[in-house]
């Protein structure tokens, strides 16, 4: 490809709405263009990277025996209603009606479609196990699309689904996917973590995420340096002990707290520690209101709450709903005298004489105790784990980091097959529900994650495996006939050798070419410039300052050998060392 013909419009200035390095460089480098919030067009360079990522993923899927299909983006509501997720999935689901007023969704995922497919085709245990996958566009109506490709409304994903006659068979396939995803990460050349994760709206009873460490990552990871435990903060369990306070129960008293709503304000006003205050949070779900109680110095983990109550539709009640249904402003909600289901974090169990909202504006109760003053219906671990909390395996203090989720695998069990009546006949002639797994990989977000992982102040540093082109040949003076001739010859030789090469034959300054080459992130640059008078061209790795001089007076043999050596040694991780 000649640079003068390549549609790669680079930008000198950073667009105003950019929030991350990957968003900036992919826009400035001419890889993507924004259409609307969370919606992008992929330009030729971006498309080449995407195809390489897709091919790596496809090769690893095929390697473990998965078979590729392609399912429709437009999905009928009836299938989602069968599984119970039409209402549960949440506002991220893009819903629409056709001209006949029938409900559809633009698929955020395809469990329902694939389950409906196989239930009409697979009849016997002899046809199992089976794994199907696709690489296709997905849609989610993100409340705030951000970070470019990392949180988009339209994105490209590989989703796979496996069907089994036994849990042992599912376990085997699950482990095969773990290995396949690890190989994908290794081929991308990035550092990664495999962490225990919450299943969320997908459901199931086990889940792992494949995460690339990054400061702007939206997955909070807790890990133990001693035993190797790794989990998302949504999944990490608190197994430490809470103090059982021994003080005598005091008389319950309602006290005025004018304008005092937050934990910090209540703590200061009443002169008590936040750990002696119990937060009362009202949520709404399928079965109406539920009040959640947790110690004031801790944060509620919504993922744990939804998992324990088996209700993904749970959301925090709005101030307007609370005022209308309970007659009290937010900030003064409490568990005493309120007829709603109450669930509490274990941190509340051992407290004595604590503070709760007074269920009346500008009031709180002091010296509250349970079960004397109110009843807790269910107790769970509902706290969000943070750095320094004890490891649930060995008890050592946990460390924290952030990461970008690229892969997510789930043991679904029979959640979908039972709901959608998808059965097979086992070896005893009995009808059994399929045992299922599902396995997602974010293809388009992989592009952004790699840029977040490998870049410097000048631009992107692509690993060889997914670079749009491996080599750029820069003719530094297009008015120099010898430079043009040699540059063209090198370009021709490399092309004939099967190298993915770009010839920068634009009538621009050498500095302009160097800046574009660094911004775009070509792994290896060959300079054809002034040193050609001595029969020398220069080779340079993207992340290195070293120029390797190669004499070409006697042909291109040494040049080709040097290029091959550079490719073998090429490692973007060196940029961070």
Swiss-Prot record:
<dbReference type="Pfam" id="PF00587">
    <property type="entry name" value="tRNA-synt_2b"/>
</dbReference>
<keyword id="KW-0436">Ligase</keyword>
<keyword id="KW-0067">ATP-binding</keyword>
<dbReference type="InterPro" id="IPR004154">
    <property type="entry name" value="Anticodon-bd"/>
</dbReference>
<dbReference type="InterPro" id="IPR004500">
    <property type="entry name" value="Pro-tRNA-synth_IIa_bac-type"/>
</dbReference>
<dbReference type="Pfam" id="PF04073">
    <property type="entry name" value="tRNA_edit"/>
</dbReference>
<keyword id="KW-0648">Protein biosynthesis</keyword>
<keyword id="KW-0547">Nucleotide-binding</keyword>
<keyword id="KW-0963">Cytoplasm</keyword>
<comment type="similarity">
    <text>Belongs to the class-II aminoacyl-tRNA synthetase family. ProS type 1 subfamily.</text>
</comment>
<dbReference type="InterPro" id="IPR002314">
    <property type="entry name" value="aa-tRNA-synt_IIb"/>
</dbReference>
<keyword id="KW-0030">Aminoacyl-tRNA synthetase</keyword>
<protein>
    <recommendedName>
        <fullName>Proline--tRNA ligase</fullName>
        <ecNumber>6.1.1.15</ecNumber>
    </recommendedName>
</protein>
<dbReference type="InterPro" id="IPR045864">
    <property type="entry name" value="aa-tRNA-synth_II/BPL/LPL"/>
</dbReference>
<dbReference type="InterPro" id="IPR036754">
    <property type="entry name" value="YbaK/aa-tRNA-synt-asso_dom_sf"/>
</dbReference>
<dbReference type="Pfam" id="PF03129">
    <property type="entry name" value="HGTP_anticodon"/>
</dbReference>
<comment type="subunit">
    <text>Homodimer.</text>
</comment>
<dbReference type="GO" id="GO:0002161">
    <property type="term" value="F:aminoacyl-tRNA deacylase activity"/>
</dbReference>
<dbReference type="GO" id="GO:0005829">
    <property type="term" value="C:cytosol"/>
</dbReference>
<dbReference type="InterPro" id="IPR044140">
    <property type="entry name" value="ProRS_anticodon_short"/>
</dbReference>
<dbReference type="InterPro" id="IPR002316">
    <property type="entry name" value="Pro-tRNA-ligase_IIa"/>
</dbReference>
<dbReference type="InterPro" id="IPR050062">
    <property type="entry name" value="Pro-tRNA_synthetase"/>
</dbReference>
<dbReference type="InterPro" id="IPR023717">
    <property type="entry name" value="Pro-tRNA-Synthase_IIa_type1"/>
</dbReference>
<comment type="function">
    <text>Catalyzes the attachment of proline to tRNA(Pro) in a two-step reaction: proline is first activated by ATP to form Pro-AMP and then transferred to the acceptor end of tRNA(Pro). As ProRS can inadvertently accommodate and process non-cognate amino acids such as alanine and cysteine, to avoid such errors it has two additional distinct editing activities against alanine. One activity is designated as 'pretransfer' editing and involves the tRNA(Pro)-independent hydrolysis of activated Ala-AMP.</text>
</comment>
<dbReference type="GO" id="GO:0006433">
    <property type="term" value="P:prolyl-tRNA aminoacylation"/>
</dbReference>
<dbReference type="InterPro" id="IPR036621">
    <property type="entry name" value="Anticodon-bd_dom_sf"/>
</dbReference>
<dbReference type="GO" id="GO:0005524">
    <property type="term" value="F:ATP binding"/>
</dbReference>
<dbReference type="GO" id="GO:0004827">
    <property type="term" value="F:proline-tRNA ligase activity"/>
</dbReference>
<dbReference type="InterPro" id="IPR007214">
    <property type="entry name" value="YbaK/aa-tRNA-synth-assoc-dom"/>
</dbReference>
<dbReference type="InterPro" id="IPR006195">
    <property type="entry name" value="aa-tRNA-synth_II"/>
</dbReference>
<dbReference type="InterPro" id="IPR033730">
    <property type="entry name" value="ProRS_core_prok"/>
</dbReference>
């Amino acid at each position: 490809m000649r640079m003068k013909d390549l549609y790669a419009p680079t930008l000198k200035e950073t667009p105003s709405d950019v929030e991350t390095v990957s968003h900036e460089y992919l826009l400035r480098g001419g890889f993507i263009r924004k259409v609307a919030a969370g919606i992008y067009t992929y330009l030729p360079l971006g498309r080449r990277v995407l195809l390489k990522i897709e091919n790596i993923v496809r090769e690893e899927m095929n390697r473990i025996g998965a078979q590729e299909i392609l399912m429709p983006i437009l999905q009928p509501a009836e299938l989602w209603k069968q599984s119970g997720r039409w209402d549960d999935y949440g506002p991220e689901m893009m819903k629409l009606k056709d001209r006949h007023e029938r409900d559809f969704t633009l698929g955020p995922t395809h469990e329902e479609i694939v389950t409906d497919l196989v239930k009409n085709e697979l009849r016997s245990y002899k046809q199992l196990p089976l794994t199907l996958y696709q690489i296709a566009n997905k849609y989610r109506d993100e409340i705030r699309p951000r970070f470019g490709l990392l949180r988009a409304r339209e994105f490209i994903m590989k989703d796979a689904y496996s069907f089994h006659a036994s849990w042992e068979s599912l376990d085997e396939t699950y482990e095969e996917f773990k290995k396949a995803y690890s190989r994908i990460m290794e081929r991308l050349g990035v550092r990664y973590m495999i962490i225990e994760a919450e299943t969320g709206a997908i459901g199931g009873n086990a889940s792992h995420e494949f995460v690339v460490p990054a400061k702007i990552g939206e997955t909070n990871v807790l890990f133990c340096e001693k035993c190797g435990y790794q989990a998302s903060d949504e999944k990490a369990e608190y197994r430490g002990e809470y103090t059982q306070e021994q003080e005598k129960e005091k008389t319950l008293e309602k006290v005025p707290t004018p304008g005092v709503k937050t934990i910090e304000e209540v703590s200061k006003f009443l002169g008590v520690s936040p750990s002696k205050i119990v937060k009362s949070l009202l949520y709404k779900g399928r079965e109406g209101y539920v009040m959640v109680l947790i110690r004031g110095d801790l944060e509620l983990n919504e993922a744990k709450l939804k998992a324990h109550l088996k209700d993904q539709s749970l959301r925090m009640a709005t101030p307007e709903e609370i005022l209308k249904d309970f007659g009290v402003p937010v900030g003064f909600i409490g568990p005493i005298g309120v007829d709603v289901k109450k669930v509490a974090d274990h941190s509340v169990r051992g407290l004595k004489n604590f503070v709760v909202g007074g269920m009346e504006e500008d009031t709180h109760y002091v010296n509250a105790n349970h079960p004397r003053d109110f009843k807790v219906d269910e107790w769970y671990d509902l706290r969000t784990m943070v750095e320094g909390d004890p490891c649930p395996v060995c008890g050592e203090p946990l460390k924290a980091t952030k990461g970008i989720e690229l892969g997510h695998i789930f043991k679904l069990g029979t959640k979908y097959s039972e709901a959608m009546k998808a059965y097979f006949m086992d070896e005893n002639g009995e009808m059994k529900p399929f045992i299922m797994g599902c396995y997602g990989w974010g293809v388009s977000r992989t592009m952004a994650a790699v840029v977040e992982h490998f870049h410097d102040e000048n631009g992107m540093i692509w690993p060889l495996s997914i670079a749009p082109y491996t080599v750029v040949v820069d003719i530094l003076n297009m008015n120099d006939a010898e430079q043009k001739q040699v540059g063209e010859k090198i370009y021709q030789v490399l092309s004939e050798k099967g190298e993915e090469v770009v010839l920068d034959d634009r009538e621009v300054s050498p500095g302009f070419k160097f800046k574009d080459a660094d911004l775009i992130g070509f792994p290896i640059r060959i300079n054809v410039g002034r040193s050609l008078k001595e029969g020398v061209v220069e080779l340079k790795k993207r992340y290195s300052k070293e120029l390797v001089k190669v004499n070409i007076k006697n042909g291109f043999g040494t040049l080709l050998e040097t290029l091959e050596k550079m490719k073998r040694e090429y490692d973007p991780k060196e940029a961070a060392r």
